[in-house]
């Protein structure tokens, strides 16, 4: 794609903005891949045991992103998450790294024009891995909170995934909120949850 960028009119990747609205996509989400493969290969379970076995793989995928993007690597510090979305939606880039929560940002392209791919970094067996799921994508309840607050929190979480109005707000997109605003478009992997309109 990069060799024919001018002819095609688009780059391979959106800008990898390094401001706070975008850097987490690369400093945490992308960085999870080499850490996962090291945990798996070495049977480790703590960050203290990380040796950086797949650090070069991480560097290579990062270099692929920034050297085949809509902008020069020297301007990454000025690029934002909104820039990346705009570049993808306007057809200036073929690939945009993000997760299911970003569906609403790109849905205007039409479901027939978008999809998700695994990120490959050259780790053995990764062709069988499939899509990543974020390690930070879970709900927590503070064990040090009062029993009353713990119960209220658990009741709220249960309500979010069982109540018809709440599930519609969580899973829906266009006009899914009681206010008529767009819903969150999340995919809820629980029995009985409404099917999400989120393609991802």
Model features per residue range: what roles?
Residues 1-47, 93:
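Extracytoplasmic/periplasmic solute-binding protein
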Residues 81, 98-103, 119, 135-137:
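Beta->alpha turn/N-cap motifs
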